From Swiss-Prot:
Changing residue 270 to A: Normal activity. Disruption phenotype: Strong fatty acid chain length ratio (CLR) reduction. This is 3-ketoacyl-CoA synthase 18. It is a multi-pass membrane protein. It is found in: Microsome membrane. CLR.2, the major quantitative trait loci (QTL) involved in seed lipid metabolism is associated with the single point mutation L407V. It comes from Arabidopsis thaliana. Induction: Repressed by herbicides such as flufenacet and benfuresate. The gene is FAE1. Changing residue 460 to A/S: Normal activity. Its EC number is 2.3.1.199. Changing residue 389 to A/S: Normal activity.
Amino acid sequence: MTSVNVKLLYRYVLTNFFNLCLFPLTAFLAGKASRLTINDLHNFLSYLQHNLITVTLLFAFTVFGLVLYIVTRPNPVYLVDYSCYLPPPHLKVSVSKVMDIFYQIRKADTSSRNVACDDPSSLDFLRKIQERSGLGDETYSPEGLIHVPPRKTFAASREETEKVIIGALENLFENTKVNPREIGILVVNSSMFNPTPSLSAMVVNTFKLRSNIKSFNLGGMGCSAGVIAIDLAKDLLHVHKNTYALVVSTENITQGIYAGENRSMMVSNCLFRVGGAAILLSNKSGDRRRSKYKLVHTVRTHTGADDKSFRCVQQEDDESGKIGVCLSKDITNVAGTTLTKNIATLGPLILPLSEKFLFFATFVAKKLLKDKIKHYYVPDFKLAVDHFCIHAGGRAVIDELEKNLGLSPIDVEASRSTLHRFGNTSSSSIWYELAYIEAKGRMKKGNKAWQIALGSGFKCNSAVWVALRNVKASANSPWQHCIDRYPVKIDSDLSKSKTHVQNGRS
């Protein structure tokens, strides 16, 4: 108990060091001021009169500096609102339904009809991965894959993506009452499906956006592309004043489904599900009052210069010529290394002085003592961040980040619940997690939320937001009909998940 109190005292002293120093300084100046006489004031005024040019120049430079700072500083970027797509109920799939879809896909593939469908080991492998994935029985599959026989056509892929994007945007425009023609910047990201005309062009056409819109379409950038899109929109909002930026993050499941027998490529079939999010950003000062959040920091880390990082998630042909996404056995180590580099950049921006000092001290000690100190000090990010939105890439990803960042079960609750309810929706998963926190009523004014996105390349990207008010869930939130059933409890044997309401956590 004593060590805990000492640590708390240490953190308080360092975090409030400048404030603590300010009190004696203020007292000293107040004491000096109380001893001033009328004669001292006359002498001071006389000094100003004899040095009028110097005083005037100093005042002019001060005013010029303040004006220059106000004019050149970037405008704040506000998150007015966002919308996560909720697919229709008939697209819900249980674990057993997903297994049936896998079987139908393999059966429909003429090159594997006599082998893969009759291979119990392949389907048994898929079943084990599916049951241990952390996904529940109410995730969503695209229309084309539910159809018997499955439709893996280009038209089915386009239909899936258009329904997700249009559905999310219609709800966003309805909630914000923003006219689509007011949008000045558009960024759409979809890794696997990039038709011509582009998805951003489809949005322009569907919602009749204006002809001078700054439009961007990001492809092939993986599950971390959502934060990349936010970062790009932020930079554009710093240049183009008084406008709105629209960010759309989604992924296509129909296009990315794998029908072969390579087990490294089968895993993604078990994790990815339908989902997408639309986010409205603004740099208009008048939008602060109605916005939910202000963007504080974005940090992007790319370790693609290393071959192991570059190849750990890769779309390629298998031995029989079928295209799939191969997940390397090195992915966990690569993700950990990339995350470490990302938080090494983000930490100094958000951590209190006490944590910065401890990290710096252990860094110097490790350099001097080398082998005597095995690990660097892991900062307590819970002192700087109130809510964590970790990409719901899978149970292993969430477990690893929970351990590496020293988080508690409630810190990763939003991620686990999103994975269970919606599966891995790729770049949009961090928005379903933020919506979960809002639906639980936990987002209070001044709270900071940290979105952590991991993706192929290999990339780790972070976005930190601060709540401008007590944030409630928006209309038509994806959690509005099921939030009372969460969080979920996953059995320790990883084989089955059961949903129940924990006392005091609903």
